[in-house]
Amino acid sequence: MSKPPILTLADITKRFDTQEVLSGFNLSIEDGEFFTILGPSGCGKTTVLRLIAGFEGADEGRIMLNGQDVSKLSAEKRPVNTVFQSYALFPHMTVFDNVAFGLKMAKVSKPEIAERVKEALATVRLSDFATRKPHQLSGGQKQRVAIARAVVNRPKVLLLDESLSALDYKLRQQMQMELKQLQRKLGITFIYVTHDQEEALSMSDRVLVMHNGQAQQVGTPREIYECPNNLFVASFIGEINVFNAEIVESLSDYRYLAAMDGFKREIHADRRFEAGDKVHVLLRPEDLRIEYLEDAPDRPGFSGQVLERNYTGQTLDSQIQLQSGQTIMASEFFDEDDPDFDYSINQKVWVDWVHGWEHVIKAES
């Protein structure tokens, strides 16, 4: 028998005054997973976090945490701790006292406090910083103190509210790796809220993408990136090229002949379509292949010209206008040993992709 989820939100509705920000919202999170709630500003992700923490109450629905209905429990009675974006460290206290604060409030014995704080600081690699004050710490160190203060209480779930957004890019990348390693080491459930797609993809076991208070898709980072449910998910997670097409006929299970941009081409889909169905063929920039027009192979593809090119060190990114007028993005890994691996502005090119790399969804109006 499989274990029940550590956290379940069932048919949650939340209103602020007359505005309904969540309606019939459902979510299940497994014990011990790193789960990220991802979406643009105003999508409802922070509201979900606050409902889990107990900082807000749901107008309708139920929240189950570790088998207990906590819908009516106050925040301090829930086995949950939150790491805020600001870290919320007490400036007049040492690192040790900041981490020990929750245990002291819970009237834990002094010997146990000392042992648990020592263990928590060792976990986040700050054992030598116990006597320092917050102003003597770097941004990354403050982040780790905030996490130590949260995990020292041994919560079932740790909530992190955009807690890396204040860090610079390189430190943020470093902390992404450290957070994931720490989560594995602790074995507790992390629920992370962010608008940053890179953070979500790099750290998470699973990701929930939200928009306008609705769950758009839940899946692994790879599922979210490679097999988006709809155009919002496809466009919110990285760059995407969208080609309109119509199913001409079914060739076999999940293989179809499609008409697109003046030619017919075989496509592969992970769902069933009928002849005449309008579809979107989705391709990431890195899925496209570019050739000089005069070197175009003898198979269906797009012709166009290069509008802009950008060398990033690892890739050569090209903006291409197709004959249809549509503008697309293509990204190819740079090959310094290929003297022809470059394109000039207005260069005539031919664009293709490897069969099976496309993702096909029902057309949206």
From Swiss-Prot:
Gene Ontology terms, MF aspect: ABC-type putrescine transporter activity; ATP binding; ATP hydrolysis activity
Span of domain ABC transporter: 7-237
Superkingdom of origin organism: Bacteria
PROSITE patterns tied to this protein: ABC_TRANSPORTER_1 (PS00211), ABC_TRANSPORTER_2 (PS50893), POTA (PS51305)
Keywords, in A-Z order: ATP-binding, Cell inner membrane, Cell membrane, Membrane, Nucleotide-binding, Translocase, Transport
Catalytic activity line of the entry: ATP + H2O + polyamine-[polyamine-binding protein]Side 1 = ADP + phosphate + polyamineSide 2 + [polyamine-binding protein]Side 1
Localization (cell): Cell inner membrane
EC code(s) of this entry: 7.6.2.11
Signal peptide per UniProt: none
Entry membrane topology: Peripheral membrane protein
Claim: Nucleotide-binding is one of the keywords in the record: yes
One GO location term (cellular component): ATP-binding cassette (ABC) transporter complex
Binding-site residues for ATP, renumbered to this chain: G39, P40, S41, G42, C43, G44, K45, T46
NCBIfam families: potA (TIGR01187), PRK09452.1 (NF006987)
Assembly and oligomerization: The complex is composed of two ATP-binding proteins (PotA), two transmembrane proteins (PotB and PotC) and a solute-binding protein (PotD).
Family the entry assigns: Belongs to the ABC transporter superfamily. Spermidine/putrescine importer (TC 3.A.1.11.1) family.
Described purpose of this protein according to its UniProt entry: Part of the ABC transporter complex PotABCD involved in spermidine/putrescine import. Responsible for energy coupling to the transport system.
Name this polypeptide is given: Spermidine/putrescine import ATP-binding protein PotA
Gene encoding the protein: potA
